[in-house]
Amino acid sequence: APKELQVSYAHKSSELVIGGDECDINEHPFLAFLYSRGNFCGLTLINQEWVLTAAHCDRRFMPIYLGIHTLSVPNDDEVIRYPKDNFICPNNNIIDEKDKDIMLIRLNRPVKNSEHIAPISLPSNLPSVGSVCRVMGWGSITAPNDTFPDVPHCANINLFNDTVCHGAYKRFPVKSRTLCAGVLQGGKDKCMGDSGGPLICNGPFHGILFWGDDPCALPRKPALYTKGFEYPPWIQSIIAKNTTETCPP
C-alpha cells in the first residue's frame, strides 16, 4: 500500500473498531479498504467482480485495495481496483436518509482468489437476536481522540433487538432494514474509518456499518448496520445485468 495510506486523520463521515485486537491475517480475505483523500471505508468482496459498502462512502476517486492487511507492508497478492459501475438504492425521503445505506460496486477488473483474497457469502436468513457477530476494519482504535492502526482490528459484538437502538437514539428512526449491534457495557465498537465494513454473524456477511454514536464505544450506544438479508435479490439482479431492479420497499 502506498505511503499516503498511513493517515492520521479522517473526516467524521467515516466510522472504527474499539476494544478489539488485530485481526488474524487469514480471517478477512473478503475485506477491502477504500482510501480517498483523507476518507476511508471498509468494503466486502462478494464475488470476483463485485464489492459492497455503504452508499455514504461514495467518492469521485475510489481506489479499492484487496488482499491488504498491514497498510505499510503490501502482501504479495494485494491488488488495487477502481469502480467500473456503482449502484445505490435511491431514497429521497430526508427523514430516512440513512435508510438503505448500501452501495454495490462493480470492479474495473475481476480479482482472482488467492491467499488473502476470497469472497464471502451473502446471507440466506436473518441472524437471531443474541448472536455474537464480528466487526472489522482499519478505523480508529481509540475515542474520543482518534488513533488509526496500520492493521485491521476485529471485535466480537452482540446483535440486539431493534428496541435497544430505538431507546438509545430516540431522534433516529430505526427501521426494519437495520441491524442493531454492539456491547451494552461499552468498550467495544466500530468507529471512525470503519464505515461500509462488514458485520459477520455465524459465517456469512450480514450487515454494512453505516452509523454509530460519536464518541464510539459508549455504554448502551450500539451501532446501526444495513441489514444484508434484505438485499440479495437486488444484488443478484444487478449482477445479472438487470440494472433497473428496484430496491426493497
UniProtKB/Swiss-Prot annotation:
Glycans are attached at residues 145, 161, 242. GO terms for cellular component: extracellular region; secretory granule. Expressed by the venom gland. Optimum pH is 6.0-8.0. One of its GO terms (molecular function) is toxin activity. Glycoprotein, contains approx. 52% carbohydrate which could be removed by N-glycosidase. Glycosylation is important, since deglycosylated barnettobin loses its clotting and defibrinogenating effects. The active site is at residues 56, 101, 195. SUPFAM superfamilies: Trypsin-like serine proteases. Both coagulant and amidolytic activities are inhibited by PMSF. Amidolytic activity is partially inhibited by DTT, chymostatin, SBTI and TLCK, but not by heparin and EDTA. It is an enzyme of class 3 (hydrolase). Residues 11-16 form a propeptide. Residues 17-240 form the Peptidase S1 domain. It is found in: Secreted. Its main location: secreted. Its EC number is 3.4.21.-. Disulfide bonds join 23-154, 41-57, 89-247, 133-201, 165-180, 191-216. One of its GO terms (biological process) is proteolysis. InterPro entries: Peptidase_S1_PA, Peptidase_S1_PA_chymotrypsin, Peptidase_S1A, Trypsin_dom, TRYPSIN_HIS. Negative results: does not degrade beta- and gamma-chains of fibrinogen (FGB). Does not hydrolyze the plasmin substrate S2251 (D-Val-Leu-Lys-pNA). Thrombin-like snake venom serine protease that releases only fibrinopeptide A from human Aalpha chain of fibrinogen (specific coagulant activity was 251.7 NIH thrombin units/mg). Also shows fibrino(geno)lytic activities in vitro and defibrinogenating effects in vivo. Belongs to the peptidase S1 family. Snake venom subfamily. This is Thrombin-like enzyme barnettobin. It comes from Bothrops barnetti.
